[in-house]
Amino acid sequence: MTEILRYCQGIMQRGIKESIKTLYYTGELKFGTLVGVDKVGNRYYENRQEIYGRHRWVEYGDYKSNDPTTIPPEYHSWIHHVSDKLPSEMLPFSPTYKRPHIANPTGTDGAYTPPNFLFNIEKSKEELQKEEKNDNKQ
């Protein structure tokens, strides 16, 4: 009975279309207050009536690829209970070595591979030719 009530509350908060999409991609329909949205489009929610550890969650901007590496460090600390303050409540901290947050490129063309790796043969040949041309110019 409580599940039916919970689904009804979720549908009332989101609407039927969004509820069906969320239920399809996540397998769960939760409701709570929207706490924030990051620059990637991830939406962060909190519901203090849920049990501890399940009362904070994220809905990814891209429904089809739920990639946890798209969560920026500011919201990572909030969602994992390192900090109870939201990024909007914290003082901005930007060290000199900080780079923009990117998702983990493993399994894509942007992934790191060592120079003598089997699939880098063409890349290494091109780099060697460029180095030889630069050496000949000097």
From Swiss-Prot:
Superkingdom, natural source: Eukaryota
Pfam families: NDUFA12 (PF05071)
Subunit structure: Complex I is composed of 45 different subunits.
Family from the record: Belongs to the complex I NDUFA12 subunit family.
UniProt-annotated stretches for the region Disordered: 97-116
Recorded topology in the membrane: Peripheral membrane protein
Chief location category: mitochondrion
Subcellular location: Mitochondrion inner membrane
Protein name: NADH dehydrogenase [ubiquinone] 1 alpha subcomplex subunit 12
Swiss-Prot/TrEMBL keywords: Electron transport, Membrane, Mitochondrion, Mitochondrion inner membrane, Respiratory chain, Transport
Organism annotation: Dictyostelium discoideum (Social amoeba)
InterPro entries in the record: NDUFA12
Known function: Accessory subunit of the mitochondrial membrane respiratory chain NADH dehydrogenase (Complex I), that is believed not to be involved in catalysis. Complex I functions in the transfer of electrons from NADH to the respiratory chain. The immediate electron acceptor for the enzyme is believed to be ubiquinone.
GO cellular component terms, semicolon-separated: mitochondrial inner membrane; mitochondrion; respiratory chain complex I
Gene name in the database record: ndufa12
